[in-house]
């Protein structure tokens, strides 16, 4: 988060920024960066010492390791949504609950809901011809469907932030009324029932 880095007396990277679910900063209500705004290099704070040679300048985590751009001065983009603020609000609540849980605080997180969300996102990443869930939900919320190059299976953790954000928004749209919307997707032949349930050790009652 550029705003977090700008406000730090000593800039540091939060562990929560590494969680695939977290695509935005709840405090500053802006999207997280995963690439340098200036040179498009991946943001990798652990590379900050690379290539310094005999330079006396102390490296800072707020600078791009490749071009030294000040990441704290990057544009702050508001989280986008396509259908209504409700999907974004649901997604933000999950991020808030997971963060509270990781800090040992009281949390309202339902792990069964996160299990379903992850399964739905995995199905939207599928490239099988029998699975149209990605296109189906994108059409429902008025978003452009993400196209996946090649045939290699991709995990959400390896996706660019903008793709993770859109997929999680699409999953959040389904989770706002899961019984109704997932059933409708199945009836529209956007997903097969056996694909929907195959990765669950214990399915939610609903």
Give the predicted meaning of each segment.
Residues 1-206:
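Basic, alpha-helical nucleic-acid-binding regions used in initiation and control of genome expression
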């Amino acid at each position: 988060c550029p705003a977090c880095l700008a406000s730090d007396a000593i800039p540091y990277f939060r562990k929560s920024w590494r969680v695939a679910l977290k695509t935005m900063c709840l405090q500053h209500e802006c999207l997280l960066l995963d690439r340098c705004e200036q040179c498009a290099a991946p943001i990798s704070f652990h590379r900050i010492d690379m290539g310094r040679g005999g330079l006396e300048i102390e490296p800072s985590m707020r600078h791009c390791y490749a071009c030294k751009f000040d990441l704290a001065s990057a544009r702050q983009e508001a989280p986008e949504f396509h259908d209504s603020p409700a999907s974004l609000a649901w997604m933000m609540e999950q991020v808030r609950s997971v963060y509270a849980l990781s800090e040992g605080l009281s949390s309202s997180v339902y792990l069964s809901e996160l299990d379903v969300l992850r399964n739905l996102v995995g199905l939207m990443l599928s490239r099988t011809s029998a699975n149209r869930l990605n296109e189906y939900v994108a059409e429902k919320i008025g978003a452009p469907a993400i196209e996946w190059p090649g045939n290699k299976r991709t995990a959400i953790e390896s996706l660019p932030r903008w793709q993770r954000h859109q997929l999680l928004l699409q999953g959040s749209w389904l989770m706002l009324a899961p019984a109704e919307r997932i059933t409708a997707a199945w009836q529209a032949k956007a997903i097969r029932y056996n694909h929907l349930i195959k990765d669950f050790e214990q399915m939610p009652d609903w």
